[in-house]
């Protein structure tokens, strides 16, 4: 074979290989296109079916709220966020009024920020309760509230939130003292508003609302903090107010109620800032038929308060002025009472079981569990529950949180903030101890 023939032969072979390669590439492209078309068709078919499936799933996890409280013998620690300790060096919000609420999937800590971070100049003067900079935000329970793990919820200086099994209802009150408005959101979208009806600091729970079979319930107060005010229960469905009822409660004072569902009804234990050192309560059903009273026990739950003694099923006037947000859990004629250890300052915390304290006025009790030592600061406290849809139990698990306030007015700082701890009721071994905030003050910004 002469050189020219060799060249032609080699070229022909190369061209043949190239054509075969091209054909294979074209086949590969066609195969990929066909495969993608099949996948897209399947995906579209799946998405077309998915909404009904998702709707069924959502409906199946609606929180029924008809279970009774779980029987318990004590309280197991559930969370501690150490927000102030972490905030001395990290980016942590200046907050107050934290509370916890759970869906069927998770528990979250809600809190009212001051639009500022700890150890920053904007934390100056944050002892003030109501300002246009305050917002309701939330983060996973047990985490320090920071810009990196928190969700904005609402502009608010008073708030509540709860999950009905299908979405979050949030209530944020903001505006001037003489005309504030509560903005209701459902899954983040504004659904309704409630205007102050007495033009005197409309305010709500500072803890979770209560949901029963798709309806959620909250209590609001409007009027004097040291005299007769007006109190309303609101029934809310998918963020819309469907019914309300004003309490006929002369000589009663309800503020900052801690509410929970129990056997298909709602029980709220509140703060009397007017003239009671024991706590007022209101219970109601889904039709807003209600009953009212005061916890009768001589183990008093408010702060300030007198030493334990003889209680009353009406307001106990001794040391009855002012008060602090708190809670109790009713078990028949018995009651678990959460309270500060100090009778005069917001320090220490303990849980007490009075087996007949809901209806009887003596001061005997059978269980006391230490939560925070009297030498450490505490603050507000409130209840929350974990529904059977979350826990897998056949009962409603009672839980509570305690705010650990630091800064002004008890420390030489320019700021006021807090961290939080929480506990849940169990019918197994528990321990009493002290779980304080633990931050060393003052911070760099204070010096």
From Swiss-Prot:
<feature type="binding site">
    <location>
        <position position="346"/>
    </location>
    <ligand>
        <name>substrate</name>
    </ligand>
</feature>
<feature type="topological domain" description="Virion surface">
    <location>
        <begin position="28"/>
        <end position="447"/>
    </location>
</feature>
<feature type="topological domain" description="Intravirion">
    <location>
        <begin position="1"/>
        <end position="6"/>
    </location>
</feature>
<feature type="binding site">
    <location>
        <position position="302"/>
    </location>
    <ligand>
        <name>Ca(2+)</name>
    </ligand>
</feature>
<feature type="binding site">
    <location>
        <position position="276"/>
    </location>
    <ligand>
        <name>Ca(2+)</name>
    </ligand>
</feature>
<feature type="disulfide bond">
    <location>
        <begin position="259"/>
        <end position="268"/>
    </location>
</feature>
<dbReference type="GO" id="GO:0004308">
    <property type="term" value="F:exo-alpha-sialidase activity"/>
</dbReference>
<feature type="binding site">
    <location>
        <position position="96"/>
    </location>
    <ligand>
        <name>substrate</name>
    </ligand>
</feature>
<keyword id="KW-0946">Virion</keyword>
<keyword id="KW-0326">Glycosidase</keyword>
<feature type="disulfide bond">
    <location>
        <begin position="257"/>
        <end position="270"/>
    </location>
</feature>
<feature type="active site" description="Nucleophile">
    <location>
        <position position="380"/>
    </location>
</feature>
<comment type="subunit">
    <text>Homotetramer.</text>
</comment>
<feature type="disulfide bond">
    <location>
        <begin position="296"/>
        <end position="313"/>
    </location>
</feature>
<keyword id="KW-0479">Metal-binding</keyword>
<comment type="function">
    <text>Catalyzes the removal of terminal sialic acid residues from viral and cellular glycoconjugates. Cleaves off the terminal sialic acids on the glycosylated HA during virus budding to facilitate virus release. Additionally helps virus spread through the circulation by further removing sialic acids from the cell surface. These cleavages prevent self-aggregation and ensure the efficient spread of the progeny virus from cell to cell. Otherwise, infection would be limited to one round of replication.</text>
</comment>
<keyword id="KW-0735">Signal-anchor</keyword>
<feature type="region of interest" description="Involved in apical transport and lipid raft association">
    <location>
        <begin position="11"/>
        <end position="33"/>
    </location>
</feature>
<feature type="disulfide bond">
    <location>
        <begin position="211"/>
        <end position="216"/>
    </location>
</feature>
<feature type="disulfide bond">
    <location>
        <begin position="399"/>
        <end position="424"/>
    </location>
</feature>
<keyword id="KW-0812">Transmembrane</keyword>
<keyword id="KW-0325">Glycoprotein</keyword>
<feature type="glycosylation site" description="N-linked (GlcNAc...) asparagine; by host">
    <location>
        <position position="124"/>
    </location>
</feature>
<dbReference type="GO" id="GO:0016020">
    <property type="term" value="C:membrane"/>
</dbReference>
<feature type="binding site">
    <location>
        <position position="130"/>
    </location>
    <ligand>
        <name>substrate</name>
    </ligand>
</feature>
<dbReference type="GO" id="GO:0055036">
    <property type="term" value="C:virion membrane"/>
</dbReference>
<keyword id="KW-0106">Calcium</keyword>
<feature type="region of interest" description="Hypervariable stalk region">
    <location>
        <begin position="36"/>
        <end position="68"/>
    </location>
</feature>
<feature type="glycosylation site" description="N-linked (GlcNAc...) asparagine; by host">
    <location>
        <position position="66"/>
    </location>
</feature>
<feature type="binding site">
    <location>
        <begin position="255"/>
        <end position="256"/>
    </location>
    <ligand>
        <name>substrate</name>
    </ligand>
</feature>
<dbReference type="InterPro" id="IPR033654">
    <property type="entry name" value="Sialidase_Influenza_A/B"/>
</dbReference>
<dbReference type="GO" id="GO:0046872">
    <property type="term" value="F:metal ion binding"/>
</dbReference>
<feature type="transmembrane region" description="Helical">
    <location>
        <begin position="7"/>
        <end position="27"/>
    </location>
</feature>
<keyword id="KW-1133">Transmembrane helix</keyword>
<keyword id="KW-1032">Host cell membrane</keyword>
<dbReference type="InterPro" id="IPR036278">
    <property type="entry name" value="Sialidase_sf"/>
</dbReference>
<keyword id="KW-1043">Host membrane</keyword>
<comment type="similarity">
    <text>Belongs to the glycosyl hydrolase 34 family.</text>
</comment>
<keyword id="KW-0378">Hydrolase</keyword>
<feature type="disulfide bond">
    <location>
        <begin position="162"/>
        <end position="209"/>
    </location>
</feature>
<dbReference type="GO" id="GO:0020002">
    <property type="term" value="C:host cell plasma membrane"/>
</dbReference>
<feature type="region of interest" description="Head of neuraminidase">
    <location>
        <begin position="69"/>
        <end position="447"/>
    </location>
</feature>
